[in-house]
Amino acid sequence: MAIEKELLDQLLAGRDPSEVFGKDGLLDDLKKALSERILNAELDEHLDVERSEGTAANRRNGSSKKTVLTGTSKMTLTIPRDRAGTFDPKLIARYQRRFPDFDDKIISMYARGMTVREIQGHLEDIYGIDVSPDLISAVTDQVLEAVGEWQNRPLELCYPLVFFDAIRVKIRDEGFVRNKAVYVALAVLADGTKEILGLWIEQTEGAKFWLRVMNELKSRGCQDILIAVVDGLKGFPDAITAVFPQTIVQTCIVHLIRHSLEFVSYKDRKPVVPALRAIYRARDAEAGLKALEAFEEGYWGQKYPAISQSWRRNWEHVVPFFAFPEGVRRIIYTTNAIEALNSKLRRAVRSRGHFPGDEAAMKLLYLVLNNAAEQWKRAPREWVEAKTQFAVIFGERFFN
């Protein structure tokens, strides 16, 4: 509903235009006046309800002052009171000292990778609000309950494709800062949209940890994964197939290429990439193996033998790639979504140095993922072709 021009003219009369949006300006005055108007209307309604229910007579009993934090300022409100003490306003509850948008603003800044000290400085510089680090931490800690609910939410029965990947995060643990792996599972649903299944901070080494993750996915309702794309970690494929025996485990081709280039001097990387392309672009597994042998015997394979050794170690989980038609291969190979996701996560943790504990790391990473979720609501163009091929290859499993 538009505000009448005459009313706006009255509000602006005699005011310096440059101060309208500043601290203690017209906007803050309006917030205060509207808030107090709402509080008085709430008390009137509360008293009317009590009278209609035949409750003992209750009436207004003066007011009290309360200083509250809004999203942009600090404001002292006159809170009306009732004699019986039964009035608890909805706008700003009895023991509440912050408007919800204030908490939302802090959480939004935290999700963008700002540290507690940076948020404190930002609120002071922009809004003139002095907020303690403890209060900021208390606000962001509210997210932990949402993290627990999200991490334990029910899953779909079947996911056509799940990418399992990891980033390294520095976390203080038992007095030492450790470089821990944080695993993320990005799933592609039958309609081509994406969903993060969960986040897990590595607590133990190897297969036992991954087996626990797989069992957790199953206990949350996931009964089948058609293709799992992993980054070549030893023991991970066995953990997946122990819980999901029908799952095809595929080594991530992009990770394998990157690992190969770690052995190559910078000036040689550009010509090595097309030489490797002949392997994973081969028409089938037999042709792929011949291309690997040709690379191994060629100039680059002789100069960097560790590359072909790496491909041979992972060959068992490279082979499934060749059995898929081009549409499915493209979806498996195109890791834009997981790469973009990891980029957001790394950017958020980079400014932190290290986290004081696992909960602090989970809190931030969850918020980053939550902000990115809007981008996954549309299926990529490639999914139209891939979906048909998934349905042909996997039949009824795809439609579960």
Curated annotation (Swiss-Prot):
Keyword DNA-binding found: yes
Ribosomal protein keyword on record: no
Taxonomic path: Bacteria, Pseudomonadati, Pseudomonadota, Alphaproteobacteria, Hyphomicrobiales
GO MF annotations, alphabetized: DNA binding; transposase activity
Biological role: Required for the transposition of the insertion element.
Domain of life: Bacteria
Keyword line: DNA recombination, DNA-binding, Plasmid, Transposable element, Transposition
InterPro entries: Transposase_mutator
Disulfide bonds: none
Pfam families reported in the protein's UniProt record: Transposase_mut (PF00872)
Entry's Gene Ontology BP terms: DNA transposition
Protein name: Probable transposase for insertion sequence element ISRM3-like
Protein family: Belongs to the transposase mutator family.
Organism, as annotated: Sinorhizobium fredii (strain NBRC 101917 / NGR234)
